[in-house]
Amino acid sequence: MKQQTNRNRRWVLASRPHGAPQMDNFRLEEDDVATPGEGQVLLRTVFLSLDPYMRGRMSDEPSYAPPVEPGCVMVGGTVSRVVASNHPDYRPDEWVLSYNGWQDYDISDGEGLVKLGDNPQHPSWSLGVLGMPGFTAYMGLLDIGQPKEGETLVVAAATGPVGATVGQIGKLKGCRVVGIAGGAEKCRHATDVLGFDLCLDHHADNFPQQLAQACPQGIDIYYENVGGKVFDAVLPLLNTSSRIPLCGLVSGYNATALPDGPDRLPLLMATLLKKRIRLQGFIINQDYGHRIHEFQQEMGRWIKEGKIHYREQITDGLENAPEAFMGLLAGKNFGKVVIRLADDA
């Protein structure tokens, strides 16, 4: 269904999921497009970013950000154009980075909007390699991982928007990079396009043995996006004074209980202690928001020089957002997942 000029479609949280989200956890609503008041702008969503963190916002467990309440619009970063403006700093047709969520239109007072120029070459990249995922990769690896030339860097979810960027930055810093991904096609992309030294399929029956063979000198940096059995295979290979930037644990986002089997916490704690391993979680905007301009300048330069490659998976139509999101959580995506809402994209 095409975007309309006078009606606003929006996906709201219909109910909180128990386990993996299902279609009945979402509800598509529609009403008239609102009119901006004094000091406000009306934004039309062109691109919507879908990211794993949104699963946490669907639950009401305590976290670093408040949950989406039932009946409210699903959250999400967006690239938008100004339709109408009563704000002195914005004019119609301008492109902006915004936070409209899963809907066609939104009203903003201008706070938090980032101008993208009149005719950005790749506007959706502001939701990926030049946005939150790229920033997450950059700061997590460089500030927490602190890569050194000749070290072995292992990256989980190696072809996702964060993992792919981590691995490429690691190569720029002189690391030997081993990726972990799901399936032969993704692994080929990691080595042939992204320049990883190796990439292993975590679906393989002998994955732990393959990882040990791929890292004969151990692991100096493990960029954690996944958790679960991948982390179990990594743990015994970690070197003394290794570093683990903890970005995400997507394998457990839909979990409703602790995994079966023995308690692994004592082994983890003992390994961290004996090997003096640094394991640090981070929330990108809260912890590193003040360094966004540093990232934008450096990443922009690398892209211009052809040193960073980026892949998107674009789905057309706001109506397809829930299905694309559920596929993302199931690992069916190949690249940054973006919903394209408008024909001018």
What is each PLM-predicted segment?
Residues K229-I308, A342-A345:
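Glycine-rich phosphate-binding loop and adjacent beta-alpha segment
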Residues S85-D89, G179-H189, H203, F207, ...:
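Short glycine/proline-centered loop/turn elements that form peptide/ligand docking sites
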Residues L127-D205:
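Mid-domain Rossmann-like dinucleotide-binding core that forms the NAD(H)/NADP(H) cofactor-binding site
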Residues D32-L50, M58-W102:
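Glycine-rich beta-strand-centered segment in the early N-terminal region that forms part
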Residues M74-R81, D89-A157:
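NAD(P)H dinucleotide-binding glycine-rich loop of Rossmann-like/cofactor-binding domains
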Residues N206-P216:
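Short amphipathic alpha-helix with an adjacent loop that forms part of the alpha/beta core around
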Residues K2-N6, Q286-A345:
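C-terminal hydrophobic helical "lid"/dimerization subdomain
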Residues W95, T152, R176, S242-R243, ...:
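Short glycine-centered segments of the SAM/dcSAM-binding site in methyltransferase folds
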